[in-house]
Amino acid sequence: MSRWLFPWSSSIKTRACRYLLQHYLGHYLEERLSLEQLSLDLYNGSGRLTDIHLDIWSVNELLDSAGAPLEIIDGFIGSISVTIPWSALVTENCTLEVSKLQVTCRPKYRGAAQGTESQSWSSCMTTSMQLAQECLKEQPEEPSEPPQPIEGLEMFAQTIETVLRRIKVTFIDTIVRIENNPGDSNLGTALEIHIKRLDYCDEAVRDSPHTVPVDIHQPPAFIQKILQLSGVSLHYEEFKTSVQTPSPTPENPLESEPVQPSKTPSWPEEPQPAPSPIQQIGSCSGCTELTIKLKQNDLFPGPKLDIDGKIGSVHLFLTPRQISNLQEILDALSISESSAIREKLLKSRPLDLEDLKLIEQDLNQQLQSGPGSLFVPDPELVPFQTIENGDMFYSMAAMTNSMTSIRSANELSDIDLESSMYSDYSSQQIPSLTPGIMLSSPRKYGRTPFSATLPQNLHKLPGKSSHPPSMELLKPEMLLRLTLGGLTVTVPHISTYISPQEDPACPEVARHFFRELGYFKDSAFSGRDFSHLRGQFEKACHLSNIRVTAVAVQLVCEQRVGGGTHQSSVDLSCGRLEILECLRQGESTSRRTKNTEYTKLMTFCSPSTSSRPCAQIHYKRSQKTPTRSSRKKQEIKVSSEILVELEEFQTDIDLGLLDRLGSIFQNGACRESYSQNDLHMTDVPQSSEDMEIRVVASKSHICLQFPVPDLRPSLERRPWAEKAVRKDCLQMEVADLDIHSQSKTGTDEARKIEITFSDLHGVYTDGEKLNVPCIRVSKGADPLAKAGGKKFIFPSILVAILPQSKVSPWYLAQDKIDDIDHPSVESPCELKQPEPSPFSSKRTMFETEEMVIPADPNEMADFQHVTLASSQYTLEITLPRAHVFFPSKEVYESLYNRLCNDLLMWEPVPELGASISDSLLSAEPHTTSNYQQDTFRMCKSAFKLDSDSDDEDSHFYSVDEAARHRRGAQDGQSYFSASVTILKGRITAWTEAKGEGAKKLDDHHGEVVLDVENGCIFSVSKYRGKEDLSYLCIQSESVALYHKATVKDYLAPVSLEIPTFLHPTNLDPTIYLSEEGVSAQLSGARKDRNQKMLSLAVRIDLNLVKNVKEFLVALRLDGATLRHHMALPYQSWHSQILDFLDVVDEPILGYSPPAVITVLHTHLFSCAVDYRPLYLPIRVLITAETFTLSSNIVVDTSTFLLRFILDDSALYLSDKCDAEVTDLRKDYVCVLDVDLLELVITTWKGNASSKLTQPLFELRCSNNVLHIHTCADSCAMLVNLTQYVMNNGDLHCPPKPEPPTEIAGQKLQPPEGPSSLPPCLPAETAQINQGDLTDALIDTGRTGKEQPETAISVDAALLEESPVSVYLFPEEIKSGNKRQTTSPSPPPLTEGRVSQESLGLSDTSGDSELTDTDDFCILDAPGIGVPPKDGEPVVRKLVDSPIAVRDGHFSRPLGSTDLLKPPAKFPVPETRIVLREISVVWHLYGGKDFGSSRPNSARAQSPRSRTSFHNARGSPSRSSVTNRPQNTWRTQGGNGRIHDILMEIQLTKVSFQHESYPEPLADGEEKLHTGDLDELPLARQVFIVQELEIRDRLASSHINKFLYLYTSEKMPRRAHSNMLTIKALHVRPEAGLGGPECYLRMSLMPLRLNIDQDALFFLKDFFTSLASGIQTIVPMELGSEASRLDGPAKSSSDCELEQETSQGSTEDETMSPSSSTDQPIYFREFRFTSEVPIWLDYQGKHVTTEQVGTFAGILIGLAQLNCSELKLKRLYCRHGLLGADKVVSYALNEWLTDIRKNQLPGILGGVGPMHSVVQLFHGVRDLFWLPIEQYRKDGRIIRGLQRGAASFGTSTASAALELSNRLVQAIQATAETVYDILSPTPPVSRCALDVRQSRKLRRGQQPADLREGVAKAYDTVREGVIDTAHTICEVASRGHEQKGLTGAVGGVLRQIPPTVVKPFIVATEATSNLLGGMRNQIRPDAHKEDALKWRADEGQD
């Protein structure tokens, strides 16, 4: 220092100092120092240097060596002042003051590897010992020997160290500017940090005047420095970019390449804003102090750099654009890519043509060499083979071109994989690790052919990252601890509706904010909460804004380095935190008039409740850099973990916040999109980052606010900055909230966000007083939990976001089939894999239509899995326990509109929506369709194709293009998929309780509870990229519905609890899973089936052009039981549910709802209906194997179609009402069995003209066969049940009916005449009579012209007073008119009679069927005139001129005539019920189905009980009944059913039609004009039976058919003829009073009766028991404990009392005007149009005197009738009959009277052989009479002789043969009797069997013709001789065995008498066969009649 004190001039000293500064610091200065810049005062120890410009090249080299992320582009120092206290250099501080430091920086890449920062600290810190050596060193050469320590040197070094420690540095007015210049914009952004004052000193010497001891040999391990900052502020500026000083570090070489327009996605360009002036964005209040602790010795623990800071408070005011640009700066600063890896990209070159040819040749050679030489087991791929999908090949997505060609392993091992990165598509795609196509299986070959292209770390399963290195192995590098007293961040909204002065980008807004902030920033955080700050900030910021306020913020950052791993961790905690949105509503320009509304984005409870911070954020980032040797194969791995711990907080969720915050993310999204585009064009990512975020909160209060959707155009919408929400909201309290997010950049893996919680309680509030708990979700026990594992399943919400470039497994499989397996393409027979669908792929046809059925569980699971895997956004919700409660329809309607309309229909602002979704949701934003991922396609040379052949090339090109075209049309991601899984859930709804007339009941409500177990709801929108296609699927393993129509009101629960999911005690079970006793008996129910109980699939197609939305709904219900409860019309469970669900959609602005078309297909499999009457002691169960319902529901349309298909259903009855468990096989009896039933219902709303063009309601029904299996008691029970249901017996006690007059021949009450009837019959009589018509079923047929009848003169009897003259109409009784109304005398028939054709009663049969077809002698016809006296017909000429025949006068019918169709002149009916193609088989059994009685075991087990039913013969003419095997247990019946006693009544193809016509409205009503009368039709019924049969199946009877249609050669059956036809027309009475009057017409075809005595008595007993079992009286006191019907009868007094009550009520009803509908039908006219011949055979067996008397019993037992003939004459009653019973009585009386008077000879003609004798004489008569008759007629005597001979041959010959056959059979019977007498008892001979067989042969197997008769006669004789010889030999051998020769001789002698008689038996039997063949040869009808009359052999065994 002494040299500096020499008396030198100041100029010399200044020049010397300048030289020293220039020598040591000159390379950091841009210019040489001038003398003007330097001023010195060495004596006082002060110096000053001004206007210093830094050399950025040198400074940047220093920063680059330190690995700093910044480079300096400009630097300037205003002045540097140095003060050195020479007098007290060791004890006082040296000061260095830097004034006006201005540094401009910009981000740059780090050039060195991680971990160099710590080395830079030590390199730039020179020790004092080194400095002292340099100062005292004189010679530069090295010493010859090691230097020795010098004592002076140590002292000098100690002094230097002491001085350096006492240096204090002060920065005044420092400005640090960081600029960022994005390459895609001409505007740059800059962040300036203004520091008013910054003090730097050593902590050890701060405020210490004493000398600090220093040890230069052992420097301190830690050095602590103090930084004190004051007046810190942040500023922001946007500027136009200019050419900056070039950086010394090499820039990105790829940035200089020209950007191809085709490779950049076309994003909308935003207008570049103008440069903005610099404005303040932040300020720090209070003192800021940083303590920097440096570690100088690595042996000590702790970080090398430790910074501890305390900051008073920070206030930020940032616009969304500023946030985006600042984020861009931070992102640029955080880039840490290695330049070595980037330089490696320069070696990439595109593949040329030579490379492609080389790869193709190599591939062809390797394919020809076979797989054995290609694939060598790779030990690295062994773990990969254990993956579940072992056949799946994974490859780099970008390497889908020639770079993936197969080459040898040795060649590919030395080739850089990046050599072809720029070929074809690779430079346009984001490479990622994604599943590829299944080219080859590692399991098959041991190694994939592309193993060389696989990443080396592929053996690690995805999602399971490698474990990070332990913390002990990583050394701490840096530790930062900051404590902020307070923090506020204010982000104003950007709105286009504010004035320019209020633009947040305007500097005036920021200046006003910080000016107002200065008034309260020092006392901002002094209160206990933040409520007092709201008013202050409202003054500071007049714009809507988002504000974050925090107190006691602590930030801890730590960095650790070791082993190529760089780990950083950040911990942030807030003592108190509040995030608010402040909205300034209103359009007024005055700032003070705007209302302020706050939205609590996140607020916390009072901190006094807990000492913990309210929010803690833990962030950890780990980066692993591969070593230099493995850098080519591996990539940089970056993993980040964020854990957020929150205390109890409250948040408001408003979707409109996305609009208001959209500006924050808009610029970021665009900026990110451009960076992604740069990424497409520059390089592949060299790092993959795993991001894991977790948010944990013990309790959270979430308020879901419902937005008001606005779908109008943008110009018409409300300002997006305004908050538009409903008053009502959903408040949810969530416990143990856990949000977990995991994403991986650089791959195609989905970003997943999982939310779990333990409990959720939701309360709906309307903003006023209503608070309704509506939802509760809780955790549930895990049934599969293992010991020590998780015992509970927590509710979870999983959101997955898939990149748009993701290819679904379905498309990959299709690509595999189409593009790889070319032989399969060439094979047309190979079936393609069906596309996954929620509808069943198994085609089920009904007639010509394909049934739409939901998919089975496996298909549904595949569809959901594939859809979830290929959807851009997926939502999966799992609810272990859930309970939803709707206390009223109003609450449900409000929630429906809020959730389904407001939330789902809300859309963000179009300008901001894309940016928000891309920034917040997309894992890979803006990956456009231009960069679609291609799959690998094999070269053509692999298939040995000539590449020069244009034909073959074009062929394979077409296949390839077809696959591309199909994938292009179908490929695409589904937009959104949602899946909700409910393990156990319940929905409780309180419905409105309505009484009669739909009036609401006070103080009552209905309750509905729906329980669901293992349910799943799945929905997908924009399926496979189709905007107009969506699907909805619902599945559930178990569903239970409980209902109660009326429940007394009680208070709703305050808090909703999770129920026990048991049966609610106060509700009735309605729908539930079938019990085991029911489901086990259904064929469709199998124990191993995995069908869901409920399956629903909905396809939603939206036609945007027509604005029509079509719903295709398929519902499947499997194994369910419906418990039917009879209720009032508005109290049934379905009506209450439909009324509850019938809500009104609130209108949405700008949205016009589309027209909805719903096509519904409902399928019920193995379902049942359980009905338990309240006042009837029976149980009813209806089962159906398959029930299908199809309908189309179109809103605002007039037509509705509903179709039912019922397959294999049955009805069961049981008398065991006390059984707790339903056992179908044990306790129930099947009484009704339906094979197939189809029902179609069509409704029409009508039109505006009120004139019907089609029926308002139409029902059409048809079926295959209907089986009824009943005994007398079960049939009576079925009738009782029918009456009970028809009368709604559960709702009230049915009234007591009038006892029947006569049933089954037993007179229970003397018959009454029409005049003695009471004025009003009970209503039940009319209902029963009308029920006879409504129970009919339908068929098609044809109508024939009504044959005109003979005009009958008016009989005098018709002019007499009508017997119904005393009948009074109710209206006449009410009006007091007691006069007797007499029917007006009928006018002459030719004028006044109503035309039957006009009334729709045309005849369907005539007499032509009954007359001889050869004669056609018309005896009587209208227009014939007066017949001649001699009776011979005479031809009369009415016209002398020739007759002109006009062709086509009668129009030809277009098709067969429908008998059910009314005449054309009839009006359109209002209601139509049509039954067609219904066949009914009624099986009548003996015994009893109910009760404890059991049949005789011998009879019950007889062979007939097993075979007679199944061998029942059908109709020989036609058989419409399918021989479907019936379930044996169904036909088994009850314990007392006797199967040996069985009769079958079959009605084949029954048709029925009922039409009701509208009531007349006025006088102008259209009427039917018929003559002089006008009739108003009210209803019309047609009942047609095509064939009626009664079959005899009694074991004791040999009869086959009891009753059937008679046909013969003379009387053949007409085609399409009907056996029974009944037509009824109801018209309005002439006087207009009373009920409708009816015209009844009936026709019947000829009948044949074969009556067995046992069958006759069985039918009599059956119907007698049936009549006695029908009881319609149900006492009022009968309840659930009702007595049995067979219990003790009531007392006579009780019966009389009830009868009087019933009669009194009937009389009261009679007085009412509406009682006319309950009266019996008045038949104005009854006609039996056809004369029906009946042929009767009767076979008596035994005398019975118990039931019918002695004489009648003897007559019935001994009578034998054969072809007794009787006729039912035509009937025509015009005097009127009241009631159907009177019609039946009238017909029976007329027929019996006619039979007694006129038909006794015909009946007696069939007694014994009388029929044959009569036929014999009839043939002789015809032989002589017919020639005479023919000669008298036309003179053709030869024709008469032919007719006489034919009649003689058919009548006389057949009668003679019949008589001869009877004589022979009598001889045979006598011989058989003698044979039985003479035959010895032992041994049993076979002759008895032969006799038995001959009897059967005689009855059932008569030969068909003479040839067969001769053959059977020969066989009979031959077998008789053989049997006789065999019998003698057998007797002799047995006698010899027993007694020797004596026994043999004795046996032969005993056998001689029967042997003598045996030839007579054989001869008569052979003769009988011969005679029978001859008779059948002459009369074929006789053989057919025998076949129909007698059973076959099988039926008798």
UniProtKB/Swiss-Prot annotation:
- Residue spans with biased composition (Polar residues)? 1393-1408, 1493-1532, 1690-1718
For this protein, the record's InterPro entries field holds: ATG2 (IPR026849)
Gene Ontology molecular functions: lipid transfer activity
Q: What is the protein's membrane topology class?
A: Peripheral membrane protein
Q: Where in the cell is it found?
A: Preautophagosomal structure membrane; Lipid droplet; Endoplasmic reticulum membrane
- Highest taxon above the source species: Eukaryota
Query: Does this entry carry the keyword Ion transport?
Result: no
Q: Where is this region: Disordered?
A: 241-281, 1292-1323, 1371-1414, 1492-1534, 1684-1718
Q: Where is the composition biased (Pro residues)?
A: 1311-1321
The reactions it catalyses are: a 1,2-diacyl-sn-glycero-3-phospho-L-serine(in) = a 1,2-diacyl-sn-glycero-3-phospho-L-serine(out); a 1,2-diacyl-sn-glycero-3-phosphoethanolamine(in) = a 1,2-diacyl-sn-glycero-3-phosphoethanolamine(out)
What are its GO cellular component terms?
endoplasmic reticulum membrane; lipid droplet; organelle membrane contact site; phagophore assembly site membrane
Any idea where the Chorein N-terminal domain is?
17-119
Q: Which UniProt keywords apply?
A: Endoplasmic reticulum, Lipid droplet, Lipid transport, Membrane, Transport
Share an example GO biological-process annotation for this protein.
positive regulation of autophagosome assembly
Q: What does this protein do?
A: Lipid transfer protein involved in autophagosome assembly. Tethers the edge of the isolation membrane (IM) to the endoplasmic reticulum (ER) and mediates direct lipid transfer from ER to IM for IM expansion. Binds to the ER exit site (ERES), which is the membrane source for autophagosome formation, and extracts phospholipids from the membrane source and transfers them to atg9 (atg9a or atg9b) to the IM for membrane expansion. Also regulates lipid droplets morphology and distribution within the cell.
Domains: entry comment: The chorein N-terminal domain mediates lipid transfer activity.
Q: Which protein family is named in the record? A: Belongs to the ATG2 family.
Q: What is this protein called?
A: Autophagy-related protein 2 homolog A
- Species: Xenopus tropicalis
Q: What lineage, starting at the top, does this entry show? A: Eukaryota, Metazoa, Chordata, Craniata, Vertebrata
